[in-house]
C-alpha cells in the first residue's frame, strides 16, 4: 500500500523535478515514465503474489460472490490496473480541484468497504489529505498537485483496491478516471 503510494508519487516527483528544477519542458519522456511504472508495478505485483496471494490470483467480480481464479495471470492484470489507474488519476488532474473532488467519494467508499483497520485508517488519511488540499486547489487554485500528487493519489487508490481485493470494482468506483483516460486515448488516436 505504501509502496504503491510513495512509488508512484516518486515517479511523479522525478517528472516534476525535471520540469521545474532542471528546466526541461517535457520532464520524463513517455517511454521513461512507462518503464518506471512497469518496473514498480511488477515489483508490487510480485510482492502481492508472494505475501497476499488471494488479492492477486482471485479477482472479485463486483456485486457477486464470484472470485475468478486467474492464478499467475494476476500479475500482468494487476500491473495493467496499477499503471492504468495511476495514469488515469494523473490525467484527471487537469482542472482546478477536479482530481481531488473525484478522489473524495473514492476514499469514502474505501472507508465504508474496508474490512480491516489498516485500510480504513489509510483511506481516512488520504481523504483528509485531499480534503485539506482541495481548499488550496479549488478555482482559482493557489497550489497545484503536479504529477507528484496525482500519481501518489493514483497509487493510493490502486493500492487500497488491491489490498482490499476489489481491483475490478475500480472500473465502477473510478468511473470519472476511466472516462477521462478513455477520452484522452480517443483524442490522441483521432489526431
Model-inferred region functions:
Residues 28-42:
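Pore- or pathway-lining transmembrane helices of multi-pass membrane proteins that form conduits
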Residues 24-28, 65-66, 172:
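Short, Lys/Arg-rich N-terminal segment immediately upstream of the first membrane anchor
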Residues 29-32, 70, 146:
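Membrane-interface starts of transmembrane alpha-helices
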Residues 20-21, 53-66:
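Membrane-interface helix termini and inter-helical loops of multi-pass transporters
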Residues 14-29, 185-191:
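Cytosolic, membrane-interface loops and tails of multi-pass inner-membrane proteins
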Residues 67-73:
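Juxtamembrane helix-entry segments on the extracytoplasmic side of multipass membrane proteins
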